[in-house]
Amino acid sequence: VSWAIYDPGHGGVDSGAVGPGGTRESDVNLSIAWQAHAATVMAHGESWLTRWADGCLSLANRAAQANYLDNAGAFVSIHCNSNGPDAHGFEVYHFPHSPAGITLATAIRDAVAHEVPALAMRGDRNGLKADGRLAVLRKTKMPAVLVECAFLSNPNEEAWLAKVETQVRLGRTIAGATMAFLAGRS
């Protein structure tokens, strides 16, 4: 059985982005990751979080945790974006030279587009973006993606991301796509 590794971005003194209404990215990321973990376990899958509470971890530590698990099959780093009040949408980053990473990114993008059709897709290829500079994509041994769920800098998306229902929906959708990806590789 392959494990899904969910990495709630930021944490501790590193809150990540903070929306105009005060919503902290690290808190939203952790909640979505917990929802993904719970959905995976409820579906009899195996899951691990790189951080289980509000604490600060280095990027190297996040990748090392995933690489330590022999059966880690997918690494999903969960984030919220920030780039001005008018920026909006969802995107998934993947390592440019990883066909499996591209497949995982596409699965998550497609699932979110289906479950949340009102959420615009951003990136180079309609919600997908290649980036070889991100440490968690570069240093993990398994297929890895970094999900930017929406923009905390946009007041409308911040209000949406702050809702528990949104966090549950995104977590379950990300988990479902990740588990389908893992099932296709076994």
Name every feature range the model reports, one short phrase each.
Residues 2-4, 26-186:
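Active-site-proximal helix/loop segments of hydrolytic enzymes
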Residues 2-22:
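Short glycine-rich His-centered loop
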